[in-house]
Amino acid sequence: MKEQPARSLVLDSEALSRLLRNDRAMAARIEASRQAGVPVLVSALTIVEAVHGKTDVSRLKWVLSRLRVEPVSQEDSLTAVGLLRDAGGLHGHKYAIDALVAALALRVPAPVIVLTSDRDDWSKLRGSHVSIREV
């Protein structure tokens, strides 16, 4: 069965980090999604996870202006708690941000593609309408 085209693209911290480092392959993926009318989303928490002391703040602001930054709501938090529980009782201390990004992926229009370097973590947290693509 042919996979449906994505209606939402969600970035994890490594995908965002690559954009911040001006990785050409990542920039091309994002631009292709934008050209296809697919919104490119990032959780507000992912920003904090992806940034480090040497991040160029001007570059960060420019990259974020080209993405849809999504806030974290109480509903997202409760969904994340359920995802952690359903994944065998994963602990929020280690998996909190991934679980909250997974909650974001579950509330946006499906089908959803998540760009991540953590395929193993995501295989535990994603819903049936969320596909994983490695960066």
Q: How would you label these PLM feature ranges?
A:
Residues 57-61, 87-88, 131-133:
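Short, hinge-like loop/turn segments at secondary-structure boundaries
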Residues 22-23, 53, 83, 125-128:
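Residue-level signal for well-ordered alpha-helical positions
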Residues 1-42, 49-67:
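Short, well-structured N-terminal submotif of metal-dependent ribonuclease cores
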Residues 3, 69-119:
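Active-site neighborhoods of divalent-metal-dependent phosphate/nucleic-acid chemistry enzymes
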